[in-house]
Amino acid sequence: MCIRDRRETSHIVGAYTMTQEDIVSGAHFEDAIAQGAYYMDIHTPDNKGLAPMIQPPTYQIPYRCLIPQQVEGLLVAGRCVSATHEALSAIRVIPIAGTMGQAAGTAAAMAARQGISVRDVEIAKLQEQLRADGVMLGEDDRA
């Protein structure tokens, strides 16, 4: 028996919604918590093929995609982040989803230690901790 993987699920409406334009333009964000270079991997609606795959430049995923607009005390990562169908097809892959999860866990720990909301985590300190833990957030992080 073959179990097909699920490429997409429900998404939050976040403080920011990542879009196709963010992927193809190589968007960079002040609140970046992950980076990717995976192409948009979209099957055609009739499931008879793939949409054209074009290698994008390196792009970043902003922390705001992990923060639901109307729910306090919650961060999300992986396929349920705030992203369009097209953008999700690029950021749903394991390395990027795992890095988003690491960022969410790190931010949650920082918020708990400081007694603040996850919305109020200082981005520079979150990025500093992620880099200390080996997360590459952009070209400046490459050796």
Residue ranges of model-derived segments:
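Flavin (FAD/FMN)-binding glycine-rich loop and adjacent Rossmann-like elements that form
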Residues: 4-143
